[in-house]
Amino acid sequence: MRKNEMSTSKQAIQWKCLESKIESKRLHYGRFLVSPFKRGQASTVGIAMRRALLQEIEGTSITCARFCGVVHEYSTITGLQETIHDVLVNLKEIVLRGDSKEDIQEAFLSVTGPKEVTAGDLSLPPGVEAIDNSQYIATITQPISLTIELEIEKDCGYRIENLAKSGKGQFPIDAVFMPVRNVNYSIHLFGSGRATQEILFIEIWTNGSLTPHEALRKASEKLMDLLTTFLYVRGGDVSLFENGEDSLDLTKSPSLQPQFGDTNNLEERVLENRFIDQLELPARAFNCLKRAEIYTIADLLNYSREDLSKLKNFGRKSVDQVSEALWDRFAKELPDKKIVLNRRK
């Protein structure tokens, strides 16, 4: 391999946002470039990213509505222009952004007509907001009161509700938990000969509850969490079960032992490749750690709480934030005393 080909193959893969625009409150667009890849790598990444963007990112949606005195979804209410079915369809399309970790949250709609009812009239729980307050729900043509109790959930993908759960004015709603509306990717070659490499272009359209940049980040985190699982597999954990018989330890087979290798330090190697930006710390704490040359989770675990509190401009609050994020993200705790694993030189 020629010298210029060798240097090209060792270039770090980088990404760049080529275009970002808000076409409407409920339609955001972003186009990204990722390169350089070796031949065949771009399609692997493109396929995985597209599926993760469309299927793995959580969204918030209305999943159930309760009306007082309504028998079935095709009922009508005097003074309400739409049928109950039409109102349910409009509620399904309301775009919400939610940060709560609760399974089910309660919301309600209580208005008096005559009035055009929109998403801005919803009374939503803390941490949940409507992206477009002008989204249409119904029109009240007479001076009547309309009250609807709602359930809001956070999930992935598309959920078809069981209509058997309907009754007594309660109507499950088919929910779309997909912040990403569409994803396209394309691959282009550059270079020549053995130095030929690939550029991956990714286009993302979202419903406004996430920006394309946020969606790309979340999809990347989902893929990393999924694949990191394999790095934690130890030889002694691999077994085969068949027909309820005793497990067969594959690592005892001489022919298979080379496939497992030395797995004792896998966890340490994983942490060396997980960077502190994955803790999503406040800017103050993050910048203080970087100034102290703490770049990875492995670096961070070399410091006790007392050690961190001695860093410049790093107070008790910052230490608590780091400790909480470390536990939430990696189920790790700061050591009681300073230890040295693999400090960067």
Swiss-Prot record:
UniProt KW Transcription keyword: yes
Gene3D superfamilies for the chain: 5' to 3' exonuclease, C-terminal subdomain, DNA-directed RNA polymerase, insert domain, RNA polymerase, RBP11-like subunit
Class in the EC hierarchy, top level: transferase
Record-linked Pfam families: RNA_pol_A_bac, RNA_pol_A_CTD, RNA_pol_L
Alpha C-terminal domain (alpha-CTD): annotated segments: 266-345
UniProt region (Alpha N-terminal domain (alpha-NTD)), positions on chain: 1-234
Stated family: Belongs to the RNA polymerase alpha chain family.
Record's protein name: DNA-directed RNA polymerase subunit alpha
Organism: Adiantum capillus-veneris
Gene this chain is encoded by: rpoA
